[in-house]
């Protein structure tokens, strides 16, 4: 009887090796592909746990899609899978599904808010999900496609150059319906991407010789909140708008697109949107005025809006706004200054905890022709004052009232 049992166990083991061997080889090969593409910075195990990571994993065969540790930052790596290819029905049988990116600050990369013809909302009426703070004691954000984190590093060097901060991003590439739910990532993918971003940044910090490390990523990251919503419900980055009851003015937005506040973030935004009915009522009220004869009625949801940003720290030094003249270089706001970019962009500045902050306002095309200048100024001042108070900022500089008038 014992001999029979031993034979059965041996046969079972052989069968396990027979069936498991190809899977083990596929996993080993996938890990090799991830390490080769991402310079050993991106942890392979949580990447392979992502929803689109099934099947065969490969990476882009070019310098622009691989991380090379001895080259300048920023860099990124791009991974492909047959699982993503099959679900999306690609002709090649594979599809780009993951991007890991790393970088350092200070950087010369321009930071640009929306211009007047950009859209804040999905033009087809689907929900819009503004990024939220990551939480967990980590300076970072969660978007509808990935997670970005940041770490101070005053004692490190990247490719021989001193740095002040490092950052890392882990994201899915246009996950779409096969790998998302109602326009959002699956909860398991949000958590995995946060883990990947944090571990990638810690690996980069070790390579750069930084002393500090990030704590473990949160393990139960909440879903993003869909927007826009009525201004009466604002309790985050647009709470100031509700408290001032600006929405009671028919010429101002009645909806908000906001996130939770986090005073440590490099970019914090409040979006103010005119709902479809209010936008059309406002257009009808000015359509007969010859001064507004070139203003067309809004043709899509959320087309008329005001977007407000606060850029902090190193990022504030790289803000660029469109200039009034088409042939002129971009306007580069500096700490201690305030003014106007093109006809629909303004900036203010302040100093918070010894670090520069640049505050910007963009008014969308069309709406910039009908919003009264004094109301635009009042909005911007109220926004900047709120942020400055919340962040204990000083030396706040506002644009002159004349900067809000076009004539």
PLM regions: where:
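Hydrophobic membrane-insertion alpha-helices, especially the h-region
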Residues: 2-23
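A short, solvent-exposed beta-edge/loop patch
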Residues: 130-210, 315-407
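Generic structural motif
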Residues: 82-84, 105, 154-158, 171-177, ...
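Extracytoplasmic low-complexity, Pro/Thr/Ser/Ala/Gly-rich segments
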Residues: 21-113, 212-291, 374, 388-407
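Long acidic/polar interaction regions in large eukaryotic complex-forming proteins
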Residues: 106-136
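Short, low-complexity intrinsically disordered segments
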Residues: 16-17, 26, 94, 165, ...
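Short linear interaction motif-like sites in intrinsically disordered regions of transcription factors
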Residues: 19-20, 29, 97, 168, ...
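Flexible, solvent-exposed loop/hinge segments that line or gate ligand/substrate-binding clefts
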Residues: 260-347
């Amino acid at each position: 009887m014992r001999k029979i049992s031993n034979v059965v166990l041996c046969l079972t083991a052989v069968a396990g090796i027979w069936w498991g061997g190809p899977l083990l080889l596929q996993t080993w090969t996938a890990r090799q592909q991830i390490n080769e593409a991402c310079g050993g910075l991106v942890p392979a195990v949580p990447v392979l746990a992502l929803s689109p990571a099934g099947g065969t994993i490969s990476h882009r065969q070019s310098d622009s899609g691989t991380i090379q540790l001895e080259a300048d930052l920023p860099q990124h790596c791009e991974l492909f899978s047959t699982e993503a290819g099959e679900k999306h029905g690609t002709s090649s049988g594979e599809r780009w599904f993951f991007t890991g990116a790393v970088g350092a600050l200070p950087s010369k990369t321009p930071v640009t808010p929306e211009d007047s013809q950009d859209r804040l909302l999905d033009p087809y009426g689907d929900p819009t999900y503004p990024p939220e703070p990551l939480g967990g004691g980590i300076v970072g954000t969660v978007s509808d496609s990935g997670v970005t984190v940041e770490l101070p590093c005053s004692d490190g060097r990247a490719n021989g150059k001193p740095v002040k901060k490092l950052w890392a991003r882990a994201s899915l590439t246009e996950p779409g319906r096969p790998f998302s739910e109602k326009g959002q990532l699956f909860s398991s993918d949000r958590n995995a991407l946060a883990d990947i971003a944090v571990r990638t940044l810690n690996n980069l910090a070790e390579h750069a010789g930084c002393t500090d490390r990030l704590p473990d990523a949160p393990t139960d990251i909440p879903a993003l909140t869909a927007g826009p919503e009525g201004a009466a419900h604002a309790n985050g980055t647009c709470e100031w708008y509700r408290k001032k009851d600006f929405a009671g003015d028919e010429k101002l937005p009645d909806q908000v697109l906001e996130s939770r506040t986090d005073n440590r973030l490099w970019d914090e935004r409040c979006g103010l949107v005119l709902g479809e009915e209010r936008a059309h009522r406002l257009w009808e009220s000015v359509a007969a005025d010859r001064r507004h004869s070139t203003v067309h009625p809004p043709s899509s949801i959320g087309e008329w809006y005001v977007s407000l940003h606060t850029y902090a720290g190193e990022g504030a030094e790289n803000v660029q706004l469109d200039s009034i003249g088409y042939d002129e270089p971009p306007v580069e706001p500096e700490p201690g200054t305030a003014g106007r970019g093109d006809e629909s962009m303004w900036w203010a500045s302040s100093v918070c905890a010894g670090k520069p902050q640049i505050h910007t306002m963009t008014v969308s095309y069309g709406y910039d022709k009908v919003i009264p200048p004094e109301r635009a100024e009042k909005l911007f001042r109220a926004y900047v004052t709120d942020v400055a108070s919340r962040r204990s900022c000083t030396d706040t500089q506002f644009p002159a009232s004349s900067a809000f008038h076009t004539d």
